[in-house]
Amino acid sequence: MFNKIGIFGKYSGIQSWDLIDKLILYFQKKKKTVILDQRSCADFPIERYGIERLERDALMKEIDFAVVVGGDGTFLDVARCIVDYNIPILGVNLGRLGFLADVSPDTMMVTLDEVLADDYTCEERTLLHVLIKKDGETLFDEVAFNDVVLHKNDSPRMIEFETFVDNRFLNSQRSDGLIIATPTGSTAYSLSAGGPIVDPGLNAMTLVSINPHTMSNRPVVVSGDSEILIRPHDNCSGTASIICDGQLTFQIEAKHETYVTRHPNFIKMVHPKNHDHYELLRAKLNWGQKL
């Protein structure tokens, strides 16, 4: 049973305030403690509810259940912060149907009734741990839920780099970049670049090239226990970046080495009891409809 609820909103998004208001009143009626996230709900008028608003690190130490109001981007941001705290997380989608924030405002209250009655499913999802090093010194240490992307910057030129899997040379390529995706991220940027859809329960990572120079360069699926190393060539200096979930960016140079492994912890995603990932795929991708 959950007793301390953390609510996260969309940055500067007053469009989420109506739902946050409903959530606060709902949980207070259920005699639950409600705390808002300072980073995403800084302007929300908490005074009328008599509740706290805490900085994210402090908030994570206080709550046992997280509700994210927004879209998949908002969910990704919170998921990266919550992964070390073993806190279940539920996403309420404000706009279009989401792969991560998959509860609609119309069914939100029914879903929460089920959750508080312990009638729900909880699914563990993997994340990626990213280290960028130069001469043994760590320059960038972050987490990604969907994907880690090596991408050229504004230059029209391709970038060149080598990829290794568990210290074994995989390939050298010229392309616009490389996507390393979790099973969750296989339906994001990776999918639009021609990558496979991977069941979210699999322990795997996919490597998908972005506009490769040679058509023989195909997506590769490797074990989730593998270590991926990206070693850029000289022409990458100042012309390419590593991007986590489309939100965290680090510009790389020729001597930078990027290591990607599975994060040791998991995200615990809360779903309604009748949640069906394949039904969600059909709805998002228009499968089974007449063309």
Swiss-Prot record:
Cellular localisation: Cytoplasm
GO biological process, one term: NADP biosynthetic process
Pfam families the record matches: NAD_kinase, NAD_kinase_C
Reaction it catalyzes: NAD(+) + ATP = ADP + NADP(+) + H(+)
Enzyme Commission number(s) from the entry: 2.7.1.23
First-listed, main subcellular location of the protein, grouped into a coarse class: cytoplasm
The UniProt record lists the keyword Kinase: yes
Amino acids binding NAD(+): 72-73, 146-147, 157, 174, 176, 187-192, 247
Keyword hit for Thylakoid: no
Cofactor or coenzyme needed: a divalent metal cation
PANTHER family: NAD KINASE (PTHR20275:SF0)
Protein name stated in the entry: NAD kinase
Annotated source species: Hydrogenovibrio crunogenus (strain DSM 25203 / XCL-2)
